[in-house]
């Protein structure tokens, strides 16, 4: 149900000990911009905010391209006709589609809704990306705060589980516009794919107690993996007005005794606190593979 990442390579690296890449953004032409804070300090939890070494005035921005490949021709977005913007939703670049949806949110709602419906009706059903195009359309209708009910119902039954899961997430935020939200979530809770059921579990926590618990009960009729189990437990506790029981900490075997054991126990508690050692170095001490902390 969850995601697993595997390290392939370092996209950029430096021998400069002050190198601090803190943000990245893909430009409309496909190039990648990387913001380098470039500071002797690391992070903001290890050093005082008023540390004199904290530089507020300097930094670097790198632009990364592939020299032997042409850049993407930037799509027409700002001020473009609605018809052009809707066709942008078919482009492969995610950030282009994102910026297009942002632009459509600022247009006349009635005009966007009307032209969006016409655009959907003329999509090629044989297009391999057909369901994805429909999902983009659903996101547009959500963005203008006028969710397309027929479309959300259609996508909740899509062939691609990614699309079904995304439709459930839209349903989470637009229940005030979909009168049978609970009934639709009940169907999602029976979905064959865990990702869809996980979205249904999370969304159930937004409902009233009676409706939400029914959906949670339905979702747990199928196996819950580690990602779903935690969400299910938390949602159930929230709807029931209780707290998630704190897991008893596993007793660590050690040869230490007396003062050494007391010191070890206190150190372990500090290490495990959120925002302290454990956050970067991880419980096993092997650190986050891509964090740069050792």
Description of each model-found segment:
Residues 78-86, 109-124, 145-157, 176-189, ...:
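Amphipathic alpha-helical scaffolding segments comprising HEAT/armadillo-like alpha-solenoid repeats
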Residues 105, 139-142, 172, 205, ...:
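Structural signature of alpha-helical solenoid repeat scaffolds
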Residues 245-272:
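Electrostatic cytochrome c docking/interface patches
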């Amino acid at each position: 149900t969850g995601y697993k990442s595997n390290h392939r390579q370092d996209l950029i690296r430096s021998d400069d000990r002050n190198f601090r890449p803190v943000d990245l953004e893909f430009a409309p032409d496909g190039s990648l911009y990387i913001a380098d804070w470039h500071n002797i300090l690391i992070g903001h939890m290890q050093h005082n905010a008023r540390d004199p070494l904290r530089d507020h005035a300097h930094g670097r921005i790198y632009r990364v391209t592939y020299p032997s490949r042409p850049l993407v021709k930037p799509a027409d977005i700002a001020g473009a006709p609605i018809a052009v913007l809707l066709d942008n939703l078919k482009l492969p670049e995610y950030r282009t589609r994102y910026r297009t949806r942002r632009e459509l949110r600022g247009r006349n709602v009635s005009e966007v809704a009307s032209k969006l419906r016409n655009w959907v009706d003329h999509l090629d059903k044989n297009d391999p990306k057909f369901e994805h195009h429909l999902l983009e359309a659903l996101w547009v209708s959500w963005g203008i705060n006028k969710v397309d009910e027929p479309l959300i119902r259609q996508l909740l039954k899509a062939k691609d589980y990614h699309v079904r899961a995304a439709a459930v997430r839209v349903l989470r935020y637009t229940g005030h516009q979909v009168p049978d939200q609970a009934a639709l979530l009940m169907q999602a809770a029976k979905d064959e794919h865990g990702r869809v059921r996980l979205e249904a579990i999370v969304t159930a926590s937004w409902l009233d107690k009676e409706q939400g618990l029914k959906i949670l009960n339905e979702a747990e009729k199928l196996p819950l993996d580690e990602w779903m189990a935690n969400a299910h437990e938390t949602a159930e506790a929230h709807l029931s007005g209780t707290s998630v029981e704190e897991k008893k900490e596993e007793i660590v075997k050690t040869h230490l005794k007396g003062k050494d054991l007391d010191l070890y126990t206190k150190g372990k508690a500090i290490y495990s606190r959120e925002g302290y050692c454990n956050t970067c170095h991880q419980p096993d001490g092997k650190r986050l593979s891509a964090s740069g902390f050792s």
